[in-house]
């Protein structure tokens, strides 16, 4: 949730904290960024059980007990709330902190309170009355109470001001003395509020209010696998984002900056699909973001619909799936047996399971009838990796020097905070052996199977190969894998008809395309009127075909910000799981 979608403001940050970052994580960009920070004397803090790599060059190091990062972070939040070192203006204007929470008993308890038009609202400081959250001139009141309903901020403060989050209560478990935790919180507060920076730049927010400057809290954070490789990793990442938000450091000068096309409204992402029928393609994308328990990948009897058990009560937020569970689950026949295992450059016994011997046994194990438990394995790779010996069918791939590749804004972006960008690779030499680029093989397979997206109305193949697909495929009208040089004349950016000369234009430009945003669009992307309107026009934010066809939740800057705004501690999508557990919302979990 850090390097893929954003990065610290290397130019302005004064205080940079690393959580669980090893030297091979996000290696080159963070090395360059750290070089900039050290070169101008910014303070670097490492939180990691061992002091190697990046932590070795940190100005201070906190040798935390593994898996307790979230507890430390929430203790820092406790200290900041206790000291009143919280960016109240940021929380009120740019987050859901001033929204009211339904506190009435019943199925809506704990969810965001809605008005008669089913829209969330706030109490306006000017009038003391309910007002639209995104209304022009509205001044949301964080401390308001309306008919017994309190704000998200009040619920959050009440929770984390509890004594169980005090440094003295967590010190032993974290392995960090209480005095050091309090000192760290004081440092964060000092830099954020006493060393704030202000950039003189006129900009207009989504409400239509104009500002003369951009206020920044020059504190930034970066976290990697060290926090996520624990059963509490999801909640630890949430806690760290909460800390950033409370300090007012998200999308402000010196803080954490999104890389376009992010931030995106939730509705711009697909939901996972899992309904299958013989002879028909899947009902939609197999990965995505669940909005509630009714979208979990469960069969009618409550059993997992996917072999990896992603998007279940056990693993509800599996945006990328659970690849490491594929072979163990297939071998166990849990939740079901499989016929064929198809892998691409996935040397799973060696680089994904952390249990090489056991996985090799699973791949060759037989049942009581002498048949392989995993009957067939198809494998594609450019190299003769160890996995080749276990495959029944091998599809030799090309190397990256022999094929076209596309690094797309539709996937993990290579953008920078100030610019949207994508790129290609193109063949510099022809293969001298009997191999085919795997992407082209997939395009061919799609056509042979008659999949709708790969064939014309007459059943003929729609694309010649992957290069043809890159240029001519459209995810939405005018939006394809590459954003540069679109349109029949090649002058459109982001949205435009396919351009037959697009790949050549990329090659002439060093294989890259880049669109720089103006200084007015640099910060507050989630609330910046000009950025949101331009991002919509370029197709960076918008709907997902087949998921929300009109998807015009972002057709105006106000609507875009309403959906892309920063969520604080309370999120309806998460609260719905508690409701389902309690028997509300039409879906109930089992005891697990």
Segment roles from a protein language model:
Residues 419-517:
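Long, C-terminal catalytic modules of enzymes
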Residues 55-56, 60-209, 213-214:
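Long, well-ordered, tryptophan-enriched scaffold segments
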Residues 51-61, 385-393:
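Glycine-rich, charge-decorated loop segments at or immediately adjacent to ligand/cofactor-binding or catalytic sites
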Residues 152-157, 163, 168-318:
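Active-site phosphate/pyrophosphate-binding segments
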Residues 53, 391-423:
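Flexible glycine/proline-rich, aromatic-decorated loop/lid segments
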Residues 14-16, 41-45, 59-61, 109-111, ...:
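Beta-sheet entry/capping signal
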Residues 86-90, 179-182, 195-197, 220, ...:
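Acidic/polar loop patches that form or flank catalytic/metal-binding clefts of enzymes
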Residues 1-47, 71, 241-390, 399, ...:
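Extended redox/cofactor-interaction regions of prokaryotic respiratory oxidoreductases
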